[in-house]
Amino acid sequence: TATTAGMAATQTCASATARPRALEQYRAARARYRQAKATLKAAERQVTPVDAFGNRKPRLRGWQHLITLPLCIAASIVLICIAPAGPVKAACAIYGASAILLFGNSALLHVVPWRSAKVTRVLCGIDYSNIFLIIAGTNTPVLFALSPSIRWPYLTVIWAAALVGTVMHIVWLRAPNWAFTVVYVVLGLAPVTLLPALWTAPAVGPAATVLIACGGAAYIAGATCFAIRKPNPIPGWFEFHEVFHMGTVIGYTCHVVAIYLVVCAL
């Protein structure tokens, strides 16, 4: 009995000693994990380029828009040439100019390795403002397929909102992502109320209406990724901002095809 009691006491002591040791080992392993994670992030910052403000800048930032720019210029020129003379041609010119400004300034901002914070800040303000201009510009030629009683009120509201958004982003350059996204999505959803009228309009019809809706969905999906800063498919190369840019390219493609269909039917 004495032997058994002694063995039990020994086991209890060993167990009591092992617990703190296991806890120490766990804490040490956790500390090593945190250190490795910090080292990895530091190495990632050294490998991944940064902008003038010190923010990480994945290598493919802006290249989607740079590739899209010459295609956008060509599409805009052809669209203006085939558009009927008068207000419709002017509307197509406005749309083309807003698209070229969007992709051109974005490529200039994101691809060129600016080191001047002042230049970067100005280009950022223009970049954010262009979002509102492309939304208003896209709606302009499409609205000429509808009656004047619908066209002019919508043009007034959309361009007024675009002007407000543009001024806001020029004055409030450091606006948080969520504030920018909320205004962007609200303005993008405004034309949704026109979808029934577009569906039945002789110069628009179902095909162009579906393309317009899909383009809007692509813009909104990209903006959502920008707001939540996810996903980041290839860290250091292709992250949430690049996903946002792809959304704008897909949205533009859907819309420019739809506008071609509308203009050819006018």
Describe the function of each predicted region.
Residues 1-266:
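Multi-pass alpha-helical transmembrane bundles in non-GPCR membrane proteins
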